[in-house]
């Protein structure tokens, strides 16, 4: 019994590449033989489980969504029978009916509680009225279970996937505590097709590639038991017409799985775009569609990935679309709630990310899309905004904090104060080239980073007008600063100074930031040194989000203008 009814939610299972075998839906179709070793321990028609889902939903609806004594229901379904207790005085005809349905009936005194319903169960040993189940519910459930002839019960099947588990009905969640569910592993939303339950209930995918493209007869395939995963790079319609796959179901995956060359070996990346919209083919360079990859991609390998500006596509395969995590959507929804609320003076989102992650490029676009969706101006300050402003104003007695002026300083051709100080520190230690820096011992690097850290901290909260705390306060409260503001950060101590907000996230992107710094044309050794310094100080306790999750949160929000 799947935790989510496949008959009523077939579209959900199709997202996992799962299509029910025909005989599970229509009993008039003779089931195709499956090897005994491939069978699951207990196989029953999917219709039985669908009837149980309907019965459980009906019983829960009688009590505002709550199952009375979920343990009894769990035992009845997964064990095939249960022991129930009825109060003395229960009509003999009712007791006989329960016994006929395979229940062991034990009589118990009412203890002078005349209003108590007819029966309860031995799942509890006291007279807790919260656990008492009516005779009507017991009869309905036991009659249904008995009709299936299930002496061993049904196994509850759950996918190890966040989206799947978030959609499990409440009445099933109430049962799970009292069962030992069979967990089907998933990888990035793709179910483990070797699982015996999946093989018994669903068509098993067969992967067609350019190297094995041939007729189904050559592969000994049947449309009753197999679906087709088209990884040939050719359109489904062409494969069906030319190779005789007209009767087969082709799995529809709208995302991509791209394999790249990398400094340390092949790199796998999932992208929430179909290949036709992405515009990449084997041999294409990483930078060709960089923004699309940055906005919709996630690296699946351990960091550092080794992807760089020189990386090229090895192959592109169809893949299931990624779903935003519940944690990411929750924290982003909190920010969007502030954006639309008339009771919030300023809505500020603080975003930390590694230096070189591409956060400024992405967040500029995010701010534009949020502005269009919300119908209001959205401001954006890069993580270098303060350092660049300070470089121009450190000797100015009364500097301007006007938002537009700060933006005019916040450009790539303006050297940051921290870049200046990092360059001075590297020169002091005799470092002028990337190779020299990378050959330093760990102890030497850490010593230099600690010195740079002191420079960063010195500017945070000093009493000077030019301190970082004063800068962010003056800019964020300025009369020309947009009410909704996105502010980038570099390191953990900025939590205390960067902006007044209760919404802070840690952005993960596709970039290998070390490689990104090496690829930069301007002051590569300075950029890499700053990246390493900031990385050690990156706040890791904030909720991690990916660019595609931030964009998806805007799409899912119910905007009212």
UniProtKB/Swiss-Prot annotation:
Cellular component annotations (GO), alphabetically ordered: host cell cytoplasm; host cytoskeleton; viral inner capsid
Keywords from the UniProt entry: Capsid protein, Host cytoplasm, Host cytoskeleton, Inner capsid protein, Virion
Main location (coarse class): virion
Subcellular compartments: Virion; Host cytoplasm, Host cytoskeleton
Keyword Transferase: no
Entry annotated with the keyword Repeat: no
Quaternary structure note: Interacts with VP2.
Function: Minor inner capsid component. Displays NTPase and RNA 5'-triphosphatase (RTPase) activities. May function as a cofactor of polymerase VP2. Associates with microtubules and plays a role in the formation, structural organization and morphology of viral inclusions, where the assembly of cores and the replication of viral RNA occur.
Protein name (database record): Microtubule-associated protein VP6
Organism: Lymantria dispar cypovirus 1 (isolate Rao)
